């Protein structure tokens, strides 16, 4: 893990809490919206401060669960040393829109954190990659018209079977295929674009890595789980209610090894 500089830790410790409210997108006609990404991190306090300071997040804690609320999705945190970074797994990175990519990158670099390639992205706008602690790989895309400083935008799967994986998601979650700029193999769920790209070699399953799993928020989750079971979908964790965190949950794994949590209740966080 790349260590944060002392100056960054001090800046984060005294950073004011953001004023803007953040929430999940309204669900589609099937009651589905994008929910969260769940990260395994070595130091939960470092991540709490980082996602607030740089991404305008709001910390929400319920029982043993720590989350960061952001426009369009949440980041859930578990304090556990990850088994590997995001890169090399099926879920290569997740992305945000920002008002000014260069300004964001300058702040990130000044804090002593790693900046990856800077380039013109698939939609013709300035993009950049930044590396957060624990191998969390994040893409930034500029959007000067953004009504908030930062908003969740996409998650990116990388696998040799990317076309089949896209078809699986569109079938299971009743989604349509829609290009994102030059990338033709993408789909949208409310709040998040899901992009799918090729890999020369097989990529690893996500469970245990820096990004452990992704999540969808579902109205009437119990009924949705019955629907998936009727389609032949097998669950790693069957539908259940977890009162301590005020969530209804279920877990499954996609054909590529991406671990998926289905939730009902994150829209109240």
What are these regions (language model features)?
Residues 5-17:
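Bacterial N-terminal signal peptides
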């Amino acid at each position: 893990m790349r260590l944060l500089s002392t100056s960054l830790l001090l800046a984060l410790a005294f950073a004011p809490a953001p004023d803007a409210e953040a929430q999940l997108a309204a669900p589609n006609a099937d009651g589905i919206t994008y929910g969260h990404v769940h990260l395994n991190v070595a130091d939960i306090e470092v991540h709490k401060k980082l996602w607030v300071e740089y991404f305008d997040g709001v910390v929400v804690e319920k029982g043993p669960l720590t989350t960061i609320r952001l426009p369009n999705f949440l980041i859930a945190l578990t304090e556990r040393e990850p088994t590997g970074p995001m890169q090399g797994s099926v879920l290569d990175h997740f992305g945000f829109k920002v008002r000014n990519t260069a300004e964001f990158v300058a702040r990130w670099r000044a804090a002593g954190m790693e900046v990856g390639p800077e380039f013109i992205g698939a939609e013709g706008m300035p993009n950049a990659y930044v590396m957060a602690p624990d191998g969390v790989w994040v893409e930034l895309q500029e959007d000067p018209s953004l009504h908030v400083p930062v908003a969740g935008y996409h998650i990116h799967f990388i696998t040799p079977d990317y076309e089949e994986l896209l078809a699986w998601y569109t079938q299971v979650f009743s989604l349509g295929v829609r290009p994102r700029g030059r990338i033709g193999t993408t789909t949208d769920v409310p709040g998040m674009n899901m992009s799918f790209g090729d890999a020369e070699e097989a990529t690893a399953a996500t469970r245990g890595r820096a990004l452990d799993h992704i999540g969808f928020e579902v109205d009437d989750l119990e009924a949705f789980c019955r629907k998936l079971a009727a389609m032949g979908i097998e669950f790693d964790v069957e539908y259940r209610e977890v009162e301590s965190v005020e969530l209804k949950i279920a877990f499954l794994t996609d054909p590529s090894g991406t671990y998926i949590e289905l939730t009902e209740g994150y829209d109240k966080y």
